Amino acid sequence: MLPFSRIAIIGLGLIGSSLAHAIRAYLPTARVTGHDADPDVRAIARRIDLCDDITDTAGAAVIDADLVVLCVPPGAMAAVAAAIAPDLAADVILSETASCQVSIIAAIRAVLPDVTLVPAHPVAGTENSGPESGFATLFQNRWCILTPPAGTEPLAVARVEDLWKKVGANVETMDAAHHDLVLAVTSHLPHIIAYTIVGTASDLENVTQGEVIKYSAGGFRDFTRIAASDPTMWRDVFLANKDAVLQMLQRFTEDLTQLQRAIRWDDGDALFEHFSKTRAIRRSIIEQGQDDAAPDFGRHRE
């Protein structure tokens, strides 16, 4: 398998900075060039020696790169793709890490119709953001889902798959539309629920914010961790994947109504059955190594 020799990462938040750390740790022969639209982020990236090179423009970052990875919010993907178009090498492989794929693939294809595109979404993260939040082991034993459009060159897909395996990820290939539906269930819906619960608690008129903070139980604290995620990225995710998110919200609303009815009518059997089923799912997640009781899924920063 021909390894990538020059990798450009556009967007140096949690995912982009972690990918830079991981490539430099596990693929030391590859040269990593990074860019971020925010000059303060670029300054931090230079200070912490995040990449071999940090450029002031996206176009400069991708010159001579054989792999370009877009790690920007979904709403910025099309503009960034257009900005780098004149400087891309003819044989470059373009990838992106968005958690919603159908609309992003279409947006990129609109400005780069002929580029070899291999999207790769790492299902990994923390509530932190920014270039100093990244660490090389973020992707260890996490899934990375590839969603190559139909007709993508198999060798290009294999090379991107190989890169993600080398930085520690488990790799799966999936249809983009199915990916978006799965992630609406496992990621997008939990985030919108967390934002809503924390927002409701902060808006209660007969309970002060001070009391909410002082007496927060473990479950509420878990929701606040999720609700601390990057608001720009999540705004873009919900808008970009709105059809799947709305579908899952409708299903969730129906299920919530059933629970409300069970509580109202003292139907303890229905509640117990539901809670037992969901408890089993939690145990399965831990058994498959997709969670850990320790912070950051038990991973240590490197």
Where are these regions (language model features)?
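NAD(P)+-binding Rossmann beta1-loop-alpha1 motif at the extreme N-terminus of oxidoreductases
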Residues: 1-54, 62-64
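Residues at the starts of beta-strands that form the adenosine-phosphate
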Residues: 6, 31, 116, 143, ...
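Short acidic-hydrophobic, aromatic-tinged amphipathic segments that line or gate anion-handling sites
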Residues: 53-57, 173
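Rossmann-like NAD(P)-binding element
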Residues: 58-88, 92-95
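Rossmann-like NAD(P)(H) cofactor-binding subdomain of soluble oxidoreductases
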Residues: 80-132
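Internal alpha-helical scaffold of NAD(P)-dependent oxidoreductase catalytic cores
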Residues: 138-225
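Interdomain hinge/lid region at the active-site interface
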Residues: 209-277
